[in-house]
Amino acid sequence: YSKVFQLFPKMQLFFEENSIKNIGHPMVIFDNYNVPGNKVSFSICLQIPEEIFTSPDSEITCGKRLNYQAVKVTLKGDYSHSKEAWDKGFAYIKATNLQESETGNYMEIYVKNFSQTHRPSEWITEIYIPVIATSPIKTEVPNSTPSVIE
C-alpha cells in the first residue's frame, strides 16, 4: 500500500495544476494480480465529471469505467486488515454460489483515508469484487444492516 499512497499526491498535483475538479473518492483498480509471483499491476484513479485528453507521453491517462455487478466489502480500520476483508468477500461469493467475473474491475475505494484522518480506526475502504450479473440479492448479515448486492 505504500506505493499506492505515494502516487496519490502526484495525481492530486496534476489535478491542481490543470484546474481539474475531483468528484469522488480516490480509488485503485487492480489490473493484474500475480499471487505466486507477488506482483500487482494497478491504476490510481480519481473521478472527474468529464473526460480529459492528455499527451501521449503523459503518465496520466483518462478512461471510463463501465457498470458491472460486484460484491462490496467495507473495511473499517487499518489497511493491514485488507487481506482479511478480501478473503471475506471471496468466501461470501463461494457461500452464495456466485461466480467471479473476468470483465469487471477489482477495486478499492478509499472513502475515508489517511489524508482525512490520522486515526486508522476511522479509515473506511470499500472493496469491490466483480461477479457475473444476476438479479440483485437481498442479504442480511448478523450484527449488520441489510444490504443489496448489485
Predicted regions mapped to residue ranges:
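A solvent-exposed interaction/effector surface
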Residues: Y1-E150
